[in-house]
Every structure is written in structure tokens, then in C-alpha cells.
């Protein structure tokens, strides 16, 4: 009976330890996030783990191109990450950002300027055995600007990301 209890404890401890390791996220990740809402474009993306509960900060600096305007934006998010199984994780987050709009539709009344935005985030990611992570996410954004119809106040931003973990 003692042998059975010892073996059961070792097996349970090994399973728990393996599960904890599978859930750990990298301290840092740097790469590209490519997607679009009001236009299509790339973002340079940096993630930094914070705390010990698989939470992280994500900062994205990017450019969106549309036939009538361009947007450069910086978004910061706080994300909570949960393991699904093995290398698969899912995450949710919330944050804010600032953007600059260059609108060339209505000359001479261009609607250029900066605006603030709030953002949410939900997605799924896969951590490969090599230090790469591939992600797919939806980031709904709510912009606070006087837009004269250039862009919507609400924009769902779908994107795919590839980041190097270190």
C-alpha cells in the first residue's frame, strides 16, 4: 500500500509539474503582427511577461494603409494567458493606444490628426518547440476622434502574429 501511495504521489507530482511548465510563457517575445481593420498593415510587436501568473504586456507599433488614408498607431495591452493543451494557449486583454490619421480624401479640408483609442484583445497562440510563437487574434478598438467619416469609431482588428521568444 505504501508503494502504491508513493508511486501515485510521484505520478501526480510529475503530471502537475509538467502541466505548469507547459503553461509558462516566455519572458520576452518580439516579432510582427499583420492584420487590418480600417486598412491593412504590419505592426512591430513586443511582449513582456509580468508577474508569475502567465500575464504579460504587449506593445504594438504599426501602420495601416487604406486607399484614402494612413494610420500610424501605438497600442499597449495587458493580457491574461491560459493554457489549452501542450503548446496551445488562449488569451484575453485590455489596453489603450494613440494613433495618427493622415486623411487625403477631402482637399483642402484634410482630416489629419491624433486620437486616442481603447482596445480589447482575444486570441489563440501556438508555441513551437523552437522559440517561435504563432498567434491569431481579434482586437476590437474604439477610437475617440472627430473623423468626418474617415474611419469608424469602432473597428474590429483581425491579425496573425509571428514572434521570436527569448
Which residues are covered by each model-predicted region?
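Residues that define the transmembrane beta-barrel architecture of outer-membrane proteins
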Residues: 26-28, 38-42, 70-74, 88, ...
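Gram-negative (and chloroplast) outer-membrane scaffold detector with strong preference
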Residues: 47-136, 164
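Extracytoplasmic loops and strand-loop junctions of Gram-negative outer membrane beta-barrel proteins
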Residues: 27-28, 59, 105-106, 142-144
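Bacterial N-terminal signal peptides
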Residues: 7-15
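Positively charged n-region of N-terminal signal peptides that target proteins for export
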Residues: 1-4
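Start-of-domain marker
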Residues: 26-56, 61
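Sec/Tat signal peptide C-region and signal peptidase I cleavage site
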Residues: 16-23
Amino acid at each position: 500500500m505504501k508503494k502504491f501511495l508513493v508511486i501515485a504521489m510521484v505520478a501526480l507530482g510529475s503530471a502537475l509539474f509538467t502541466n505548469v511548465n507547459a503553461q509558462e510563457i516566455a519572458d520576452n517575445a518580439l516579432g510582427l503582427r499583420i492584420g487590418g481593420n480600417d486598412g491593412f498593415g504590419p505592426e512591430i510587436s513586443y511582449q513582456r511577461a509580468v508577474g508569475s501568473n502567465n500575464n504579460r504586456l504587449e506593445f504594438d507599433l504599426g501602420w495601416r494603409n487604406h486607399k484614402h488614408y494612413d494610420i500610424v498607431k501605438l497600442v499597449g495591452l495587458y493580457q491574461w494567458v491560459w493554457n489549452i493543451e501542450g503548446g496551445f494557449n488562449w488569451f484575453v486583454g485590455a489596453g489603450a493606444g494613440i494613433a495618427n490619421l493622415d486623411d487625403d480624401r477631402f482637399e483642402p479640408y484634410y482630416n489629419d490628426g491624433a486620437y486616442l483609442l481603447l482596445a480589447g484583445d482575444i486570441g489563440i497562440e501556438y508555441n513551437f518547440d523552437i522559440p517561435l510563437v504563432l498567434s491569431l487574434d481579434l482586437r476590437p478598438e474604439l477610437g475617440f476622434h472627430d473623423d468626418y467619416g474617415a474611419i469608424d469609431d469602432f473597428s474590429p482588428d483581425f491579425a496573425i502574429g509571428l514572434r521570436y521568444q527569448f
